[in-house]
């Protein structure tokens, strides 16, 4: 009597051009009309075990690569394990090869949409990166220097209060920031260095904690350069940009090991006069990025990166509509021409990743940031101080941000089905001095708030995904966050107030999650998600006012589907809701937090990606939300600036060579700027276009923003203001920063081959 061996097929998948491993490749194993699906790990490895003798067919799919099929035989008299090396050839995007359920994480089917956008849409700025998140709108209102105002799923997230942002696992949001809670300045990121975007809308992912109420976005930088490059750009109204990205390891050069290693540097310089403003913006920014990635062993990788960013700018602020109507200023004029500021951030980031023989993955990361911020603004002009004006100076006098992220992931067979367990542990600390001052023409003459703050967060999470059947998955998890707050007031002009403004407190928040996924087939996934999340409050509020919520909870829930109605079309739809215990708004003039009470938001997200021909793609995002305060009377319960209807769509032509082009629109509808809807924030429709021409080693590009030269309000608020000579009580109306007019930009890029080839 003989018994068939139980065999194993395993392998490593690499890029046929660069020889770099390809993570998250969909691998399909077929035999006797039975199919198994897996994905490669972070090191490009895959494995199928418990295989009986017979004939097998392997097919490999990865977005941006040509699919590949190969046949294998497992014979009873051969070794139990077959190891193979597979190389995939880079190729144009083909939506017919994209499967819905072939993801490393069962809950990340939405990121199929993001991956398509990353391959098709040009990104030339940090703003472009944020706009890759479906349904996310942004607004800039300080000469380009401040973090963008973010709108998503019915939230005016301010500068990040309700949207968490990460770059290579490092948090971007700043707790208890001088300009507002959760402030997320992405301008230290050079867009050409970004390799991938992971989006998690809602409160359903255990990995994300503070600020991840409307959602979270995580950007991952490239581990290597396919080509060295130099790019030069010139735009109307005095816009200049220069970029260089260079590999620093030549052929057969190594640093720490004899295995595959990469080291590259990227440097960017931006200067934008923005002369369409009467008070020229003169925005100037320098960026530097250095990254090492290497395989220390066959199972362990090391990533080390450093970032430097510095910018300086002038701003025209938000101007009241009546000042334009009365002819006091033009649309691009300024009532206080001395607005502006400076900011800088320096980052260090190191990550060690190990994949064990049993497939378990251990990740350890440490990071450090040093941050400065100095902003001069004037929101109300002469409402509070009729002599000197209401100018304020918000200042971060050197923030230290440092932390650790760790996780352990393992798959086990439990009752004949797969159970994936992820255990995570993290910490984050912020310390430094924060201040708010009264200023006139950038000369400070009074201190409103000044003190040192320390915020410490320790978090842990457990995430379990159990495959009940071949099609049904349940994901359950819980996250625990502990916060400790400390603030020491340092007012010298009013020392008698320091004790009452100082203090410490701590709070723990538990956030359970429960999600269900059903893979109807390779092209249809149904899902139902739910979970608690939160956004934290400012240290200056929680240590002095015990009645304020320290960590207000959010409950999110949604049902939906990601599916392919035809081979070359991908659709995602979700019906969602989110209840927030406490709506928090930062009052910049006095450094206080305004509590607005409970809110509920209900909405629908709809996204389509469609490949019309081999080189022509169409995309559409439509988003609707209905948000209201729960405890306010009907008609008085609008959530100010909460977006209701937004849409983005475009056509992209991307052949292998020659001309490529993109034509895209952005639309946001009118929305309430105040609770009773008596003041309206105006919507807009903008059309943008890009044309590129590629020849060997060169790319020439033309970009046109706001093709129809529409007058539009980029940032807008209901604000009580007073100009000189007006009644003391001021006037409550819409104040706004005008959006840019039509702008033409030309660019040229020179590519030269990366000669590095490590074995």
Where are these regions (language model features)?
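Transmembrane beta-barrel wall of Gram-negative outer-membrane proteins
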Residues: 8, 234-273, 277-316, 340-357, ...
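Face-selective signature of the C-terminal outer-membrane beta-barrel domain
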Residues: 295-309, 341-492, 519, 523, ...
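C-terminal beta-signal and adjacent terminal beta-strands/loops
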Residues: 618, 670-671, 693-759
């Amino acid at each position: 009597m003989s018994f068939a061996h139980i065999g194993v097929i395993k392998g490593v998948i690499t890029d046929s051009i660069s020889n770099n491993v390809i993570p998250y490749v969909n691998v399909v194993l077929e035999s006797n009309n039975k199919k198994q699906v897996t994905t490669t790990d972070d090191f490009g490895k895959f494995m199928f075990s418990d295989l009986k003798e017979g004939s097998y067919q392997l097919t490999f799919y990865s977005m941006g690569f040509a699919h590949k099929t190969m046949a294998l035989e497992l014979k009873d008299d051969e070794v139990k394990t077959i190891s193979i090396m597979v190389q995939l050839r880079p190729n144009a995007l083909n939506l017919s090869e994209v499967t819905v359920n072939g993801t490393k994480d069962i809950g990340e089917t939405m990121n199929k949409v993001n991956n398509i956008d990353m391959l098709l849409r040009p990104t030339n700025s940090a703003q472009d990166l944020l706009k890759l998140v479906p349904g996310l709108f942004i607004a800039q209102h300080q000469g380009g220097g401040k973090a963008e105002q973010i709108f998503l799923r019915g939230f005016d997230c301010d500068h990040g209060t309700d949207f968490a942002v990460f770059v290579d696992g490092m948090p971007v949001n700043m707790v208890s920031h001088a300009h507002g809670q959760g402030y997320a300045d992405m301008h230290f990121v050079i867009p050409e260095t970004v390799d991938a975007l992971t989006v998690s809308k809602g409160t359903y992912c255990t990995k994300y904690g503070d600020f991840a109420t409307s959602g979270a976005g995580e950007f991952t930088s490239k581990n290597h350069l396919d080509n060295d490059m130099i790019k030069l750009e010139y735009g109307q109204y005095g816009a200049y940009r220069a970029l260089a990205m260079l590999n620093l390891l030549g052929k057969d050069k190594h640093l720490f090991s004899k295995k595959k290693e990469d080291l590259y540097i990227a440097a960017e310089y931006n200067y934008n006069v923005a002369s369409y403003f009467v008070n020229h913006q003169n925005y100037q920014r320098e960026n530097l990025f250095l990254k090492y990635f290497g395989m220390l062993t066959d199972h362990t990788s090391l990533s080390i990166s450093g970032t430097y960013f510095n910018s300086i700018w002038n701003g025209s602020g938000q101007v009241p509509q009546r000042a334009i109507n009365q002819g006091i200023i033009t649309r691009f004029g300024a009532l206080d021409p001395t607005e502006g500021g400076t900011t800088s951030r320096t980052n260090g980031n190191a990550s060690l990743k190990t994949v064990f023989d049993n497939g378990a993955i251990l990740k350890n990361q440490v990071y450090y940031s040093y941050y400065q911020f100095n902003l001069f603004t004037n929101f109300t002009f002469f409402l509070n101080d009729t002599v000197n004006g209401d100018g304020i100076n918000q200042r971060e006098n050197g923030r230290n941000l440092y932390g650790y992220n760790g996780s352990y992931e393992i798959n086990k067979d439990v009752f004949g089905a797969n159970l994936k367990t992820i255990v995570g542990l993290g910490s984050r600390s912020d310390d430094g001095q924060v201040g708010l001052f009264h200023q006139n023409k950038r000369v400070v003459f009074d201190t409103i708030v000044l003190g040192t703050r320390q915020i410490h967060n320790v978090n842990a999470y457990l995430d379990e995904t159990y495959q009940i059947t071949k099609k049904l998955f349940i994901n359950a998890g819980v996250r625990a966050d502990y916060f400790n707050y400390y603030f020491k007031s340092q007012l010298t002009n009013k020392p008698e107030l320091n004790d009452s403004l100082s203090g410490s407190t701590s709070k723990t928040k538990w956030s359970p999650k429960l999600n269900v996924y059903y893979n109807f087939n390779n092209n249809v996934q149904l899902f139902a998600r739910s979970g608690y999340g939160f956004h934290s409050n400012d240290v200056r509020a929680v240590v002095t006012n015990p009645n304020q919520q320290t960590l207000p909870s959010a409950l999110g829930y949604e049902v939906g589907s990601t599916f392919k109605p035809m081979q070359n079309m991908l659709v995602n739809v979700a019906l969602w809701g989110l209840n927030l215990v406490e709506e928090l708004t930062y009052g910049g003039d006095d450094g206080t937090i305004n509590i607005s009470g409970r809110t509920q938001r209900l909405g629908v997200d709809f996204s389509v990606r469609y490949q019309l021909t081999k080189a022509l793609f169409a995309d559409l995002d439509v988003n609707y939300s209905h948000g209201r305060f729960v405890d306010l009377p009907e008609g008085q319960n609008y959530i100010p600036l909460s977006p209701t209807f937004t849409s983005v769509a475009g056509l992209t032509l991307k052949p292998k060579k020659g001309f490529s082009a993109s034509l895209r629109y952005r639309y946001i509808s009118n929305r309430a700027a105040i609770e009773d809807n008596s003041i309206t924030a105006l919507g807009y429709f903008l059309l943008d276009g890009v044309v590129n021409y590629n020849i060997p080693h060169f790319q020439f590009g033309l970009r046109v923003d706001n093709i129809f030269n529409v007058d539009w309000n980029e940032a807008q608020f209901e604000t009580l203001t007073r100009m000189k000579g007006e009644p003391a009580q001021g006037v409550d109306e819409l104040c706004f920063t005008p959006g840019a007019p039509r702008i033409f930009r030309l660019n040229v890029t020179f590519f030269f081959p990366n000669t590095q080839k490590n074995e």
